[in-house]
Swiss-Prot record:
<feature type="modified residue" description="2,3-didehydroalanine (Ser)">
    <location>
        <position position="28"/>
    </location>
</feature>
<comment type="function">
    <text>Lanthionine-containing peptide antibiotic (lantibiotic) active on Gram-positive bacteria. The bactericidal activity of lantibiotics is based on depolarization of energized bacterial cytoplasmic membranes, initiated by the formation of aqueous transmembrane pores.</text>
</comment>
<comment type="similarity">
    <text>Belongs to the type A lantibiotic family.</text>
</comment>
<protein>
    <recommendedName>
        <fullName>Lantibiotic nisin-A</fullName>
    </recommendedName>
</protein>
<dbReference type="GO" id="GO:0042742">
    <property type="term" value="P:defense response to bacterium"/>
</dbReference>
<dbReference type="GO" id="GO:0005576">
    <property type="term" value="C:extracellular region"/>
</dbReference>
<feature type="modified residue" description="(Z)-2,3-didehydrobutyrine">
    <location>
        <position position="25"/>
    </location>
</feature>
<dbReference type="Pfam" id="PF02052">
    <property type="entry name" value="Gallidermin"/>
</dbReference>
<feature type="cross-link" description="Beta-methyllanthionine (Thr-Cys)">
    <location>
        <begin position="31"/>
        <end position="34"/>
    </location>
</feature>
<feature type="cross-link" description="Beta-methyllanthionine (Thr-Cys)">
    <location>
        <begin position="46"/>
        <end position="49"/>
    </location>
</feature>
<dbReference type="GO" id="GO:0005102">
    <property type="term" value="F:signaling receptor binding"/>
</dbReference>
<keyword id="KW-0929">Antimicrobial</keyword>
<feature type="cross-link" description="Lanthionine (Ser-Cys)">
    <location>
        <begin position="26"/>
        <end position="30"/>
    </location>
</feature>
<keyword id="KW-0614">Plasmid</keyword>
<feature type="cross-link" description="Beta-methyllanthionine (Thr-Cys)">
    <location>
        <begin position="48"/>
        <end position="51"/>
    </location>
</feature>
<feature type="cross-link" description="Beta-methyllanthionine (Thr-Cys)">
    <location>
        <begin position="36"/>
        <end position="42"/>
    </location>
</feature>
<keyword id="KW-0044">Antibiotic</keyword>
Length: 57
């Protein structure tokens, strides 16, 4: 198994950097009546299909 088998979107930071930068990526596949909606904590009345939030700096 090589390290290229999985893309975990990891960021390496050296000691010279002044701090870490936020890189948050999340994809929500919540739909009303969706079996995974409850597992993801979605409100079934307000859940929408293929919502996504991407925050990167």
């Amino acid at each position: 198994m090589s390290t290229k088998d999985f893309n975990l979107d990891l960021v390496s930071v050296s000691k010279k950097d002044s701090g870490a930068s936020p890189r948050i990526t999340s994809i929500s596949l919540c739909t009303p009546g969706c079996k995974t909606g409850a597992l993801m904590g979605c409100n079934m009345k307000t859940a929408t299909c293929h919502c996504s939030i991407h925050v990167s700096k």
